[in-house]
Amino acid sequence: IGNYKIVTLCGSTRFKREFLEVQKRLTLEGNIVISVGLFSHSEDNKVWENMDEGTLTKTKSMLDDMHKRKIDLSDAIYVINVGGYIGDNTKSEIEYAKMTGKEIMYLESTNVLKR
């Protein structure tokens, strides 16, 4: 949009600190940054406690789909891959970004999925 690249952050929500650091850095570099709505592997995990299994499944599916829509809005994704860790959901997001022609950037260099 305008002179600004839109970048969606992808990665395990266990890396909340890194998400916040990268979000700040990319914003100060002149990017519009889209991040996750909650950090389910950190203190936000309480959100799941009172959900029945059906609601939990639907909610997680909705959040996964919403993240793909965030990628649709973006020019690029930025993968938060601390220690080289890339989980299954993040791998799926990387593949989706590739299929839709998005630039893919990584916090840490990796050879994962560069076949």
Give the location of each predicted region.
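Conserved catalytic or regulatory cores that recognize and/or transform ribose-phosphate-containing ligands
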Residues: 1-115
